[in-house]
């Protein structure tokens, strides 16, 4: 079998809309640049711009880096003939917090108890109420009474989950995962005015070294999720046991870039993706 050639093969970096792209523009364009270095014909595609060439671009792409947190734009053909990063299962599990909870429980990983929002599911206060598709700390609320829930903009309760408030939640850890391997881990500490430890909302961040048994647990979770680039957000209880909070599909890298300015994260990501992509293409040729 001859060498797999990448020249002029079509690749897409997909974002949902212009605002999302502009927020992550440096990262997105760096991904494009690294793909072009590998001789691929790469471009950014926004899902909100469904022009006459939209379907053709999706169908022609052999490699799609899906940063949109959505899968409904992909066809059956893409599932078979396109190398997707992240794959369907990661996108589906990570972008619905109730599905994340169910998947973690099914696989017997410790996580924060979650249930669909209703009067019956709240036994005591305070609680955390969050939208199932929220990310970046948006639509996440600390609620101290039933009256406070009434003042939230909730139209459909089934789109929201409720969790117990954990005192350890002001310190959160994020493991950046690339095809089952841990790139780096950061520690996030919420500022005095916040109960959530999000970098985009002013959390203090630092690099963190995992103990061997914690690393083993994170790798076990990553192995079950399989391939892709994503992040696992977790807490550590007083026994240093991992309690998974969320799985971040379109994981941002701003905190990592700030802490590791010499780490070319997009180069590492694309180098690994290209290696996997070549294996995918070889497998297609054989079959």
Swiss-Prot record:
PROSITE patterns: ATP_GRASP. GO terms for molecular function: ATP binding; metal ion binding; ribosomal S6-glutamic acid ligase activity. Residues 115-287 form the ATP-grasp domain. It comes from the Bacteria. GO terms for biological process: SOS response. It holds the Pfam family RimK. One of its GO terms (cellular component) is cytoplasm. This is Uncharacterized protein MG011. It comes from Mycoplasma genitalium (strain ATCC 33530 / DSM 19775 / NCTC 10195 / G37) (Mycoplasmoides genitalium). The lineage of its organism: Bacteria, Bacillati, Mycoplasmatota, Mycoplasmoidales, Mycoplasmoidaceae.
